[in-house]
């Protein structure tokens, strides 16, 4: 693939789209053959009418298509730009030769994914991926395939897209016409956004005005400052000497066209040379609208989406009488997209159309002929799910009409009588071909539309109105989709160019015929010049009925393809909210009682809209935190510790919820916490991550998830100065594992809850009633949730003895079915590593634990749903198992092992008399199952405090004990006490290590089982995929055989007709010979008749003579002595003789 180059003279004031990698070679498509279309006969035309084709054939075989001669040159469309490789039906971007595999989107660099207009590369359905080192362009087979690829790439770059606030920039623009340009020239425009070329118009010749009428729509744009339209003369190749082809430009600031309303006006063109004429110079009419759509996290739209999904019928019926047609269009568009993505589109359209049927009553001819929400909704749904069907059914036919000069004008007032017969023949041929394309497209008719039409038919049958179901289907499909697409292909993305006058007239006449065919109506007195098509209409009514029956047949729904495009649900919800908020605000301001009653009928919708509007205008601290934190998680891999990001959050006074300790009995606790407490935030993802040594330096966040910030309890702002103290030791995230090391000298362990929460989550304050005066309010983690304020009761002896048996990792169940944890390679945390770390941590525990105490311990256990349960360890003192080395500085990060969480010292909390349990604000949270036995706890505390009862201590001894409680023992005393404690519990630790090893083996076996199950599932999915592929191949083979059978049938019919014609010719020749023989006999008889006539004439004359002679003799009295004898000669003559 090469960089599309534009001649220098065409781009004096803008830069072109960035080039692509030079590693790819251009594969230009063959140029169109410009030979005219020829048709040997009617049946040949019908053979070309089948919709079925494969991508391995060119889209338009101009040597065999129907007769539309004099093709136009396509140079004005491609402008010599290299085209992308032509895709085949069996190829995919996933093939090994695809360039998608060459992209590395996980390096943290900014990546931009945007669609490319077809006028840039001369190829449809392309998109461009731009990154720091260059850019690449890719071509897809359809718009839906392109949209899905773009969305998948964007989610790879920004996995947290749905869970963060974002802005979507959308531009819709029409370049309509220009005036006052030089005549007899061809002109085109280039559309640039911030000096980057995004699209071109086609070339148009100047007449009175230059009319382009082309529409451009761009989504997911970067922030824009200006829209620039450059105008050029289209110089012919033979006249390249004229390099002055630049006309001028129009610059439109985006601020002037920003809003919900379109701005349409004439803009003066700025030319390189000032205009010296009297006129004001050239100008261009442009209609545009630029919108920045602010989209909140999907969580914010939950209630709104539920309301729309459940109450769409009420919403439409209430708003129908009070909103404009433009608002109806936008409302219908948003509702259709939202309900299609939520699976309710069929119910929505069925309910709306049936309400239309009830409203119209006996006047069912008005259905889909009014500007109602139902009409606009079915229009939008047809465009949404039927776009690819429209291209398959009519794309080639429309392109052929554009490229032909065939004249189909049949109005006698607009053409001569000598041309009328030919024009009528042309129109009839085009209508036959168009209808043949449509009725043969049933095999690719969208499944969703079949389901909707079948639902309409069933509802009409239930209501006893089955006679109008056919009218509903034909009116929606033809009146609102196919016929408008034939009349205006550019509005339905079939063609970019607006048709010229002759092509537009041809398309209009074809649409008239097809619409009358769908209505089962003939042409009447209004359009008498179209009456010659009535025979065609009557002949094709049967085919139309069969087509309507086929596309509404529920038995064939599973055999047809479905909608596979992408819908940005967040954007559609934001658009719908903006529209409804504007409408409801206007209604609420009205003084009319009807308008106020309308608002009241909407129920909770105004409040829901107001809440979303408040979130849009005033982002909450939670959203601000999430936005700040998302900056660290914009890519799947995050390097280094996240403690700096968290420290920034806690440096904000409004975000810190830590109380300063007030109670004198807890001053020692306050002091010790400031110096020694370590915090760790657990990742919110439900996926388990593999631990390795690399994880000590780098935390990897799973793709598609957001890290949940810690929940903070609600406190007073005046007590936030300890927030930074708590962060002396930074935080390390590793997967979803948890390790907490905290050293404290307080007396009891606070009750702990575990709250599983779904990602994403942010910090949120707890109920104010949970704040206890003088208590410490530390961070509470998502999984498990630690609260160090409320007292925890003691544990029975039976629970104490078996407490460590219940230890487990805090890892969540991942997508790989890992219940406990996952080990990887050479960095697995084995028990030897664990023992080594335990030995290394002995010196640390000697320095940082309070001697002469047996400290209870609480560790979380993660169940299958991500909830942690607390188990109490009696006589804990696990200093020997601490992981941090003795030289651990305040800036050191904690490390989470791959198998378990280790605590260096136990936690004890001062009991609070009225201390209520803090609860996470989650319905799934549950309390730790620890029984309340305070007496045992007090007894244990008294036993570990001192061999001497505190009541017998002197003031000096009590002071010394207080100092010791603050961790200020001498080094040798600490070591002595620690050694005694270690010796006492060494055997117990060995037992626990054995138990943990056994649990490790069990977990490993579970992991293997889960991997085996996953493999079986993958094999089943692969088998299912192969089965579907086989079914698809069978379907294609069946369709191919059907097509071959149709072709063979047509060929046999043609051969039979030719044979009949030959037989007729033979019969005709034989009859001609018989006729010739008969003619000869007739001629001979005629000659004999003529001779007999002449003989008869002579006979009569002889008789007359004899009669006269005889009469004379009688009168004279002379008797004839010798009578005259009459004799006949041999040749037939008479002779007189006398005796």
From Swiss-Prot:
Region (Disordered): 1-87, 684-704, 751-782, 803-869, 910-953, 1116-1139
Pfam family, one: RasGAP
Residues bearing PTM Phosphoserine: 16, 89, 663, 864
InterPro entries (alphabetical): C2_dom, C2_domain_sf, DAB2P_C, PH_domain, Ras_GTPase, RasGAP_CS, RasGAP_dom, Rho_GTPase_activation_prot
Keywords per UniProt: GTPase activation, Phosphoprotein
Signal peptide residue numbers: none
GO cellular component terms attached to this protein's record: cytosol
Entry-annotated residues carrying Phosphothreonine: 620
Bias type Low complexity, positions: 916-928
Keyword Phosphoprotein set for record: yes
Effect of residue 165 to W: In a colorectal cancer sample; somatic mutation
Residue span, PH domain: 41-158
Domain C2: 149-267
Residue spans of biased composition, Polar residues class: 17-36, 751-760, 803-818
Biased composition (Basic residues): 45-56
Any GO BP annotation: multicellular organism growth
Residue(s) at site: Arginine finger: 369
Subunit-level organization: Interacts with PEAK1.
Function of the molecule: Inhibitory regulator of the Ras-cyclic AMP pathway.
Protein name: Ras GTPase-activating protein nGAP
Gene: RASAL2
């Amino acid at each position: 693939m090469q960089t599309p180059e534009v001649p220098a003279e065409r781009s004096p004031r803008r830069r072109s789209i960035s080039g692509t990698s030079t590693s790819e070679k251009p594969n230009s498509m063959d140029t169109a053959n410009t030979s005219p279309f020829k048709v040997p006969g009617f049946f040949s035309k019908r053979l070309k009418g089948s919709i079925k084709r494969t991508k391995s054939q060119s889209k338009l075989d101009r040597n065999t298509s129907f007769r539309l001669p004099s093709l136009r040159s396509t140079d004005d469309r491609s402008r010599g730009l290299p085209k992308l490789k032509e895709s085949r039906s069996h190829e995919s971007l996933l093939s090994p030769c695809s360039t998608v595999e060459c992209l590395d989107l996980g390096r943290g660099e900014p990546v931009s994914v945007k669609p490319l207009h077809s006028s840039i590369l001369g190829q449809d359905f392309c998109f461009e991926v731009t990154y720091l080192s260059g850019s690449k362009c890719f071509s897809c087979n359809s718009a839906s395939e392109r949209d899905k690829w773009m969305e998948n790439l964007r989610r790879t770059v920004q996995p947290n897209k749905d869970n963060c606030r974002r802005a979507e920039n959308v531009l819709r623009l029409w370049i309509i016409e220009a005036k006052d340009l030089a005549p007899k020239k061809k002109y085109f425009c280039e559309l640039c956004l911030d000096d980057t070329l995004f699209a071109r118009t086609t070339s148009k010749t100047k007449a009175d005005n230059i009319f382009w009428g082309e529409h451009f729509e761009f989504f997911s744009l970067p922030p824009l400052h200006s829209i620039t339209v450059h105008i050029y003369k289209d110089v012919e190749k033979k006249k390249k000497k004229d390099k002055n082809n630049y006309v001028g430009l129009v610059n439109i600031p985006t601020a002037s066209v920003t809003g919900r309303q379109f701005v349409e006006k004439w803009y003066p063109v700025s030319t390189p040379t000032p205009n010296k004429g009297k006129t004001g110079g050239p100008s261009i009419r442009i209609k545009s609208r630029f919108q920045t759509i602010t989209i909140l996290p999907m969580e914010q739209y939950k209630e709104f989406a539920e309301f729309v999904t459940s109450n769409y019928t009420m919403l439409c019926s209430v708003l129908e009488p009070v909103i404009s047609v433009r608002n109806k269009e936008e409302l219908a568009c948003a509702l259709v997209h939202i309900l299609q993505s939520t699976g309710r589109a069929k119910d929505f359209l069925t309910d709306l159309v049936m309400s239309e049927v009830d409203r119209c009553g006996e006047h069912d001819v008005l259905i889909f002929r009014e500007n109602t929400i139902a009409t606009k909704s079915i229009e939008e749904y047809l465009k949404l799910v039927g776009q690819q069907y429209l291209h398959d059914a009519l794309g080639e036919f429309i392109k052929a009409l554009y490229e032909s000069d065939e004249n189909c004008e049949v109005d006698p007032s607009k053409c001569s009588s000598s041309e009328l017969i030919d024009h009528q023949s042309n129109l009839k041929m085009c209508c036959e071909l168009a209808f043949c394309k449509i009725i043969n497209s049933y095999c690719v008719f969208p499944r969703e539309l079949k389901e909707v039409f079948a639902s309409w038919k069933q509802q009409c049958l239930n209501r006893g109105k089955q006679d109008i179901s056919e009218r509903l289907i034909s009116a929606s499909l033809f009146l609102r989709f196919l016929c408008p697409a034939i009349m205006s292909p550019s509005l339905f993305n079939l063609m970019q160019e607006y048709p010229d006058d002759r092509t537009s007239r041809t398309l209009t006449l074809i649409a008239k015929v097809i619409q009358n065919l769908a209505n089962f109506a003939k042409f009447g007195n209004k359009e008498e010049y179209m009456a010659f098509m009535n025979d065609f209409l009557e002949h094709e009514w049967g085919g139309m009925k069969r087509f309507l029956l086929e596309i509404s047949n529920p038995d064939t729904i599973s055999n047809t393809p479905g909608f596979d495009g992408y819908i940005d649900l967040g954007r559609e919800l934001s658009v719908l909210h903006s529209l409804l908020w504007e409408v409801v605000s206007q209604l609420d301001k009205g003084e009319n009682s009807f308008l106020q009653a309308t608002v009241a009928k909407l129920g909770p919708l105004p409040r829901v809209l107001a809440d979303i509007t408040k979130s849009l205008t005033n982002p909450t601290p939670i959203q601000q935190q999430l936005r700040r934190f998302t900056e660290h998680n914009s890519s799947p891999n995050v390097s280094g510790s996240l403690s700096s990001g968290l420290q920034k959050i806690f440096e904000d006074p409004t975000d810190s919820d830590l109380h300063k300790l007030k109670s004198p009995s807890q001053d020692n606790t306050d002091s010790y916490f400031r110096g020694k407490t370590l915090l760790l935030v657990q990742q919110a993802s439900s996926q388990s991550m593999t631990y390795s040594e690399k994880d000590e330096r780098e935390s990897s966040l799973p793709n598609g998830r957001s890290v949940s910030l810690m929940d903070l309890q609600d406190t007073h702002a005046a007590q936030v100065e300890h927030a930074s103290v708590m962060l002396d030791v930074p935080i390390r995230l590793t997967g979803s594992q948890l390790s907490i090391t905290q050293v404290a000298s307080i007396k009891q362990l606070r009750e702990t809850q575990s709250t599983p929460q779904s990602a994403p989550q942010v910090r949120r304050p707890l109920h104010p009633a949970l704040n206890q005066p003088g208590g410490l309010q530390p961070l509470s983690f998502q999984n498990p949730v630690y609260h160090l304020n409320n007292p925890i009761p003691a544990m029975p002896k039976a629970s104490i003895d078996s407490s460590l048996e219940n230890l487990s990792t805090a890892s969540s169940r991942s997508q790989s079915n890992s219940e406990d944890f996952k080990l990887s390679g050479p960095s697995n945390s084995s028990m030897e590593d664990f023992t080594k770390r335990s030995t290394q941590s002995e010196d640390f525990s000697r320095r940082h634990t309070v001697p002469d105490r047996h400290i209870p311990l609480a560790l979380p256990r993660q169940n299958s749903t991500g909830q942690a349960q607390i188990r109490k360890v009696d006589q804990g003192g696990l200093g020997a198992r601490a992981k941090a080395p003795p030289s651990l500085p305040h800036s050191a990060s904690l490390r989470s092992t791959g198998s378990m969480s280790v605590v260096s010292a136990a936690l004890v909390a001062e009991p609070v008399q009225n201390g209520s349990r803090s609860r996470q604000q989650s319905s799934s949270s549950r309390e730790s199952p620890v029984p309340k036995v305070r007496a045992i706890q007090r007894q244990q505390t008294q036993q570990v405090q001192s061999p001497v009862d505190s009541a017998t201590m002197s003031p000096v001894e009590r002071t010394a004990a207080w100092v010791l409680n603050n961790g200020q023992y001498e080094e040798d005393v600490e070591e002595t006490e620690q050694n005694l404690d270690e010796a006492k519990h060494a055997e117990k630790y060995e037992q626990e290590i054995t138990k943990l090893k056994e649990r490790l083996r069990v977990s490993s076996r579970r992991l293997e089982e889960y991997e085996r199950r996953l493999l079986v599932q993958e094999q089943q999915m692969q088998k299912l995929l192969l089965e579907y592929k086989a079914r698809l191949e069978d379907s294609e083979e069946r369709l191919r055989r059907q097509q071959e059978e149709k072709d063979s049938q047509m060929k046999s019919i043609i051969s039979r007709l030719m044979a009949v014609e030959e037989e007729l010719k033979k019969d005709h020749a034989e009859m001609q010979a018989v006729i010739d023989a008969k003619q000869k006999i007739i001629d001979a008889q005629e000659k004999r008749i003529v001779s007999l006539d002449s003989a008869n004439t002579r006979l009569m004359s002889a008789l007359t003579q004899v009669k006269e002679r005889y009469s004379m003799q009688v009168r004279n009295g002379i008797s004839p002595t010798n009578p005259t004898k009459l004799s006949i000669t041999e040749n037939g003559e008479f002779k007189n003789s006398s005796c």
